[in-house]
Design a protein with these regions (language model features):
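Conserved catalytic core of nucleotide-sugar-dependent glycosyltransferases
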Residues: 35-124
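Aromatic-acidic/polar surface patches that form glycan- and anion
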Residues: 4-8, 92-93, 126-133
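Nucleotide-sugar donor-binding/catalytic module of glycosyltransferases
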Residues: 6-8, 32-42, 137
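A glycosyltransferase accessory/donor-loop signature
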Residues: 110-203
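Glycine-rich phosphate-binding loop signature in dinucleotide/nucleotide-binding domains
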Residues: 19-23
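Non-transmembrane alpha-helical segments in soluble domains
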Residues: 13-16, 104, 138
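Active-site-proximal specificity loops/subdomain of glycosyltransferases
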Residues: 1-18
Length: 203
């Protein structure tokens, strides 16, 4: 696949192929560290034992709406005005392994070609403005028949992002301060806030 971002998105949409014996797949980005051991309730609803899929209503005119709403609706086959929620709300999103294949097959039937081709063309036609794998998986589940596979808490953006992880943008590499903050958290020496206080705030 010629575009690196398109390739990593497609890679995540094929996560099931990497772990054939797993029942579920939990995604945590490579620029993210956990701030404590995960509890079952961080990932699954304790009552239903289904993966948590927090959803946040799109704010009209917001960056999230402008960036994700139309392309997500196009990818999953619904009207943009019917897509009320965003689903890329936090790190630690989890999906049943079988769900990925269901999504890929449905997307390929809808668009009449391999999903990898659709992603490459999307990148080319928009000069690199991507679809989001997590927005697409969430929207497909909510609007196209997968609601029974997840628990759907409707939350605010702040509550949705309360997953115990620290994510720092690393596209430009790790500078000295950021590296020290991440090493501090990984070492378990302190909380993220204390690590940042001692080393200087990292945005």
């Amino acid at each position: 696949m010629p575009h690196a971002d398109a390739a990593q998105i497609f890679d995540k949409l094929c996560a099931d192929l990497y772990v054939p014996a797993a029942r579920f797949v939990l995604h945590i980005d490579s620029d993210t560290v956990l701030t404590r051991p995960l509890a079952f309730s961080d990932v699954f609803d304790p009552r239903t034992r289904k993966p948590l899929m927090p959803r946040v209503r799109y704010a009209p005119g917001s960056e999230a709406e402008l960036r994700w709403r139309a392309v997500t609706a196009d990818l999953v086959g619904i009207e943009a005005e019917d897509l009320e929620f965003q689903f890329m709300t936090r790190q630690g999103l989890c999906y049943p392994r079988a769900f990925y294949g269901t999504f890929r097959r449905a997307a390929e039937r809808l668009h009449g070609r391999p999903l990898s081709e659709w992603l490459v063309d999307r990148f080319a036609s928009t000069k690199g403005h991507p679809a989001s794998e997590f927005e697409a998986l969430g929207a497909f589940a909510y609007y196209r028949g997968g609601r029974d596979q997840f628990a759907w808490p409707a939350v605010t953006q702040n509550a949705a992002s309360s997953f115990p992880a620290l994510q720092k943008l690393s596209w430009g590499g790790l500078d000295t301060t950021l590296r020290l903050v991440l090493e501090c958290v990984i070492a378990g020496a302190s909380t993220p806030g204390n690590c940042e206080t001692g080393l200087g705030k990292v945005s």
